[in-house]
Amino acid sequence: MFRTVLKSIGGGLLLIVLLLVLGTVVPRPFFAGDASGVRDREILLLSNPIHTDIALPVDDDLRRVFSELQEGGIAVNHPAAAYLVFGWGGRSFYTETPTWADLKPMPVLRSLTLDRSVMHVDVTGDFPADLAGVKRLRISEAGYRRLVTAIRASFLRDDGRDGGKVRLISGVSYGLTDAFFEAKGWFNALAGCNTWSAAMLQEAGIRTGWWTPLPLLLRWSATLHN
């Protein structure tokens, strides 16, 4: 009986490893798109051991597109603003765990099952060129436009309309420069923050692995397939 249980556990772990390997080495999209456009735009993929964000360099056009975020305290027009940083995730874990010291059982449980989603937005200065956890990616102007549109479409809005106001989650932030907003979709362990980041990169014309639930796998796949 004990050996049977061990074999089942071992088989399950082997299957998970196989899925992670295949999810990384099999590209999405499977066939490379049109690469004729000049990749004169740079975006950043920011990562820590469990989460990824996408950072867009601030310019006048980006300020205009995301001017609505000012109502949530995001200082898009601040003269020192260099990047707008976007991250999608599960509401309980994302909003209640700013540091590992804040880790609690219920948010972890919800992140492993099913939870409503939120969008975290921060405005930052520049990032050092050699900063760990920062991957610089080059994309075309058309890819950049698609990416901005996809990020904007990830916000949940009043009346469910694309032109409606974004929904600020009042009283929740990590510091003075960031805010949380209601987002579209549901978060779970299989389709989490890193699969959202992968989907955004795909919109930008960056190929990723087919399924990359971990930051390290997403970074590896972006290097492998581009």
What does each of the following model-derived ranges do?
Residues 31-32, 37-182:
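Non-catalytic ligand/cofactor/substrate-binding and regulatory segments of enzyme domains
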Residues 2-28, 32, 153-226:
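Activation targets extended, charge/polar-rich intrinsically disordered C-terminal tails
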